[in-house]
């Protein structure tokens, strides 16, 4: 068995473990700091919405264009007066996105691009997206996200309890905020692929959280009938028992996404992969973090505020104090007995061998001598 497998077995049986719940304030602080940074980035820089959401034009040139991406981007911005995004496709053609343009402007931009690129205007394909259609798509995307969140909370409240539903909801908001904030900070374009990535990472984060919650539900069944563990301690054991599984699942999911983001988008220059791969990469990492460090410790906080759990904690601590007192008294009695049994250092050595007794004067009187008379 591998070392990781051995560690997983020891974590599952409670032989080793890290106290996530005890140190929850540290993880809460880290999450709050990251979330504030994401919100500030979102407020200052804002999201770079794609033309699918704000409207605009997309121009596609013929294959095997010799013009560079940077030069084409400069020509497109000069022709339109707006920011342009240029991507070189696999067949050598150029894809030029310009937001905030209408039909009349797109015709003029198309003429200017044909002159700069030395290509006939008829060979440049132009697709227009109206701003009203983009707003409609954006509104439907947000509505779909909101409906998803509501359904998740209802399901968790029915399958588990409302405290777990609330903790899972907080974890999902945590993951969305961090992912959207990272998008704002790096300046990547928000496209329908980004929305797909967000929905995907929400499902993954929810799955990872439900795995821990299911283990917690099983281990806390009839918890008030015992006086060995508190709810927080059982919650911590649930995290540790599923820790290796969560790590393995996260690593396996992150590897192909990292390949899309860093190799496909970064090294090979396939920029269209960035919109979905970045949301998946950040969201998967944030989801794994929130399911371990946020959701379950938050459930422990909410549960231990209940009167039953408070009474259980008092009984557990009282029993431990009583056991510790008995252990100390037994240990002190054993030490005292051992001290009394020890001889002092200056004691004379014990006499070993036959004991010399004084001779009796009347020894042999009245007894037959054994001689014949």
UniProtKB/Swiss-Prot annotation:
TM helices/strands, residue ranges: 26-46, 142-162, 166-186, 193-213, 251-271, 280-300
Cellular location(s): Cell membrane
Compositionally biased intervals (Basic residues): 362-373
First-listed, main subcellular location of the protein, grouped into a coarse class: membrane
Biased composition (Acidic residues): 333-346
Keyword entries, A-Z: Cell membrane, Membrane, Protein transport, Translocation, Transmembrane, Transmembrane helix, Transport
Record InterPro entries: SecD/SecF_arch_bac, SecD/SecF_bac, SecD/SecF_CS, SecD_SecF_C, SecD_SecF_C_bact, SecF_bac
A Pfam family per the record: Sec_GG
Cysteine pairings via disulfide bonds: none
Region (Disordered): 322-373
One of the record's GO molecular function terms: protein-transporting ATPase activity
Coiled-coil positions: none
UniProt keyword annotation of Acetylation present: no
Topology of the protein relative to the lipid bilayer: Multi-pass membrane protein
An annotated GO cellular component: plasma membrane
Top-rank taxon, per record: Bacteria
Gene Ontology biological process terms from the UniProt entry: intracellular protein transmembrane transport; protein targeting; protein transport; protein transport by the Sec complex
Chain intervals with Low complexity compositional bias: 322-332
SUPFAM superfamilies named in the record: Multidrug efflux transporter AcrB transmembrane domain (SSF82866)
Subunit structure: Forms a complex with SecD. Part of the essential Sec protein translocation apparatus which comprises SecA, SecYEG and auxiliary proteins SecDF. Other proteins may also be involved.
PANTHER family named among the record's database cross-references: PROTEIN TRANSLOCASE SUBUNIT SECF, PROTEIN-EXPORT MEMBRANE PROTEIN SEC
Family in the record: Belongs to the SecD/SecF family. SecF subfamily.
Function: Part of the Sec protein translocase complex. Interacts with the SecYEG preprotein conducting channel. SecDF uses the proton motive force (PMF) to complete protein translocation after the ATP-dependent function of SecA.
Name of the protein this chain belongs to: Protein translocase subunit SecF
